[in-house]
Design a protein with these regions (language model features):
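Glycine-rich, proline-tolerant flexible connector loops at the mouths of alpha/beta enzymes
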Residues: 86-89, 139-148, 200, 266-275
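Generic structural signal for well-ordered alpha-helices
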Residues: 87, 125, 152-156, 179, ...
């Protein structure tokens, strides 16, 4: 687990109920180059490799506070002090892939496999709807049992019952034809983390049968079809460098996704990366802030992984420019089995507990949870 976070700016409610950053003078000992670089990145909505290196090396409290404050200001211009909430349904932990970092990889014989039925998933949606969720995220491994027909039937059923809700799919690499079928059935969004945009790094994380080119093509296919598209990567994955992170940011700039999901790499004991060091909260928060500065309107989650490496991780993510949280709606008896990484939080809480816990956490830092679809705002 991470140590206590570095100090960050306290926030209070302004008269208009939008979160207001308490102004504190920047100490003169903060490197002026850092402040200037942050302002340049914000204004240009782009970053060079040299600028990225400089910002990721910030280690003084004032520099870290400044970049996070600037990211929050940028986020609030579009989204105010509203945190968008999604209900996560992890419906299968079967997967045909063998990614070296993932606890549900094909060759992990220790994984306790499960699949939810359509009825179970609709029950999750029903309880979620009552709790105010208006986006459902259906996430799972690449499981051949769930054919295109089954996915389309499920999406159609959810949209028919809850026409005011968005359905997000996160079920991996498929053909363009499959993606089109899901879209025509009513799916609104699709999350597909690219994990790394660097070819050599991709090969360190995945077996030979998987290809970065194919994953990138999937993202472009999804965008062309008309989805709100999400990509993303782990922070601190084995083999990651400042140079590979720069490639990630360039891919994001090229793709212009509606969502970017990043969180710290956390090892899982039954994978080839069991003994690898986890990514840090500090670097994750800095990267959240950088992504917000260069993509002001992007939907940016404060992930469960961030909450796993620090008890206040999700709050700190919001205070670094994130604006989405995804409490778990999955049945409690399967949550522990969806073990992408170890020590995952909130596996024993009922959906209502997760919902109100999240609301209270956000209130504690001056934010409100929005009961809406939470679409991307241009």
């Amino acid at each position: 687990m991470e140590s206590e976070p570095k100090p960050f700016t306290q926030i209070s409610q302004g008269k208009n109920k939008h979160t207001k950053i308490e102004e504190k003078p920047i100490k003169t000992n903060m490197n002026e180059e850092i402040k200037s670089t942050i302002n340049k990145v914000k204004q240009s909505r782009n970053i060079s490799l040299e600028q990225l290196k400089l910002l990721l090396e910030i280690n003084d409290d004032e520099g870290v506070r400044f970049i996070r404050e600037e990211a929050v200001k940028v986020c609030q211009k579009t989204y105010g002090n509203r945190v968008l909430i999604r209900g996560l349904i992890e419906f299968t932990n079967f997967c045909k892939n063998d990614c070296y970092y993932c606890g549900i990889r094909r060759s992990n014989s220790q994984a306790d496999r499960y699949r939810l039925t359509k009825e179970q998933m609709l029950d999750c949606c029903a309880s979620g709807y009552e709790l105010g969720f208006r986006t459902f995220v259906l996430q799972g491994g690449e499981d051949g049992y769930f054919t295109d027909d089954k996915i389309c039937d499920l999406v159609s059923a959810i949209k028919e019952k809850y026409p005011d809700c968005a359905v997000t799919l996160s079920i991996g690499e498929k053909s363009k034809e499959s993606y089109k079928r899901y879209f025509d059935a009513g799916a609104d969004r699709y999350l597909l983390r690219h994990e790394t945009a660097d070819e050599a790094h991709y090969k360190k994380l995945h077996p030979e049968e998987m290809s970065l080119a194919h994953r990138k093509q999937c993202l472009w296919d999804l965008k062309e079809i008309g989805y709100q598209v999400g990509c993303g990567f782990m922070v601190g994955s084995p083999g990651q460098t400042v140079e590979t992170l720069y490639e990630d940011l360039q891919l994001i700039r090229e793709l212009q996704p509606h969502m970017v999901g990043i969180g710290p790499f956390i090892s899982q004991k039954d994978t080839p990366f069991a003994d690898k060091a986890s990514g840090t909260m500090e670097q994750t928060l800095k990267l959240l802030a950088i992504i917000r500065l260069i993509h002001p309107h992007v939907l940016l989650p404060a992930t469960t992984a961030l909450g796993t490496i620090h008890p206040k991780g999700r709050e700190l993510g919001i205070l670094s420019g994130a604006n989405v949280v995804m409490p778990n709606l999955s049945p409690v008896n399967v949550r522990e089995k969806y073990k992408l990484y170890d020590n995952k939080i909130c596996t024993g809480n009922e959906a209502a507990e997760c919902r109100y816990c999240m609301e209270n956490r956000m209130k504690s830092i001056g934010y409100e949870v929005a009961v809406s679809r939470g679409d991307y705002i241009e």
